Amino acid sequence: MFVNRGYMRPIKPLRVNIQDYDVIAVGTPTWWYTMTPAVKTFLHNENWKGKEVIPFMTNGGWPGHVIKDMKKACTEASFFDEKQIQFDFTGGSELVTPQKEIENWITNIKNNIW
């Protein structure tokens, strides 16, 4: 697998211009301790100057360095209230992160950004 070697997958152009937005939430599952290749490509291809990014990720118990990698890719952005959302380690859909914690995170974003 090329994920652990920094592979960036070609992606189709977005149908929206992120320059029209001040705040952008970007999420990804964890693959080989980092973000998915498509998300990595997206983050590296955009101009993040003056943008507020809300990074979040999902994982099965091994968060790796996803958030750190996302921040590194979004050069010149500022960041608000990152979040790791954990599911069970067997690859299932059982949420480990308490639902209330996720709801509080969303409320914090709504109260402080919008």
State the predicted function of each range.
Residues M1-W114:
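FMN-binding flavodoxin-like domain, especially the glycine-rich phosphate-binding loop
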